[in-house]
Every structure is written in C-alpha cells, then in structure tokens.
C-alpha cells in the first residue's frame, strides 16, 4: 500500500470541437506560464472503483521550473520523493532505503512536472480539454498521448487563479485525489530540498530508466 502514497506525486470521455480544444490548451498553458514555483501542503485520498477510501495521506511539497520537485508524505508514515531536474530520489524512512533513478521527462510518468516543467511540453504530452468551468473554478482534463502512462487521465482544477486540486485515474478505475493547501506561488522555495543526501546506513538502490 505504501506505493500509493507517492503517485505524483481516474468518467466517460466528452467530445470537444477543435476550437474548444485549442481554447482549453491555450488557457491552461497561460496559467502554467505564470508559475515559476509553488509550495504548500496537500491532502491525498486514494479511492477504488466504487469510490471507497483505500488510503489517506498528508504532507507538504514544493515544485519549481527546471523539473525540480520535493514531495514529503508525513502521515500515516514518512516517505519522500525529490528531484533536482536530473535525478529522482525516493526515500522510505521506515525501511531506511532510497531508490535513485534518472528523472523521466515523460509527463505521463511524472505528474509533478505539470507544474515544474515547461508549459509547452504539456501540450506535447497531453490532449487537453475543459471539463468544467464555473467562472472562478475551472477544471481541465489531460489525457496522456504517450505509451504506458502512469495514469489514464488527469483532472487539474484552478480556483481563483491558483491550482486547487489534481485527480488521477488509472486503467483499473482507481483514483488518487490531491487537494493543495496554503499555497505560496513564485516565492519562498528552498532549493536545497531538491537534492537528497541519504542518512548514514541507508540502503541505496540504483535504478536505470
């Protein structure tokens, strides 16, 4: 069950006209273009096909341009994922183990890069449509174009111009819902968190992409 916590860090498809698709893409990319960095807390819930809660988690995160991110799950147990834009570290404190691997540039494999990568790459990686628009609250649906993505679809919601939540659905219908809390945009990033030096005695597992 632990692997569910770090899904960074899941309704029938609606058909959109080419004009609507283009508008949604331009609108989302315009929002992402203003984000140089983002940090805050998160609440994460994993749901099965029937909507039953399988797991809940709380933590904090930060992402920044250059494909850099830091994602710390604090409860129910501590796990951390970080990237300096080249390397990813996934650390399990209880197991005293860290997995080290190259960062995949595939946004379908690394959802955190939606906010930390180049906005233009988002349009290349996803088919984008506007799923819901309530004025101050807008939800975009992103469907991966690549092969073997981590998820089948990703809904990202903005409220008052800020990212508010993400909902990922996999091929089995399992959903991961992430609500962002107390966001700070474009300020206050601790760049040292994007690199991880394992504590002495940690088992280091090197993986190739």
UniProtKB/Swiss-Prot annotation:
**Disulfide connectivity?**
none
Instruction: Cite a single GO BP annotation.
Output: lipoprotein localization to outer membrane
Q: Which InterPro entries does the protein's record reference?
A: LolA/LolB/LppX, OM_lipoprot_carrier_LolA-like, OM_lipoprot_carrier_LolA_Pbac
Q: Organism's domain of life?
A: Bacteria
SUPFAM superfamilies per the UniProt record, alphabetical: Prokaryotic lipoproteins and lipoprotein localization factors
Question: Gene Ontology terms, cellular component aspect?
Answer: outer membrane-bounded periplasmic space
**Cellular location of this protein?**
Periplasm
The task this protein performs is described as: Participates in the translocation of lipoproteins from the inner membrane to the outer membrane. Only forms a complex with a lipoprotein if the residue after the N-terminal Cys is not an aspartate (The Asp acts as a targeting signal to indicate that the lipoprotein should stay in the inner membrane).
The UniProt similarity line reads: Belongs to the LolA family.
Q: Partners and quaternary state?
A: Monomer.
| Protein name per the record | Outer-membrane lipoprotein carrier protein
> Which species is the source of this protein?
Alcanivorax borkumensis (strain ATCC 700651 / DSM 11573 / NCIMB 13689 / SK2)
Q: What is the lineage of its organism?
A: Bacteria, Pseudomonadati, Pseudomonadota, Gammaproteobacteria, Oceanospirillales
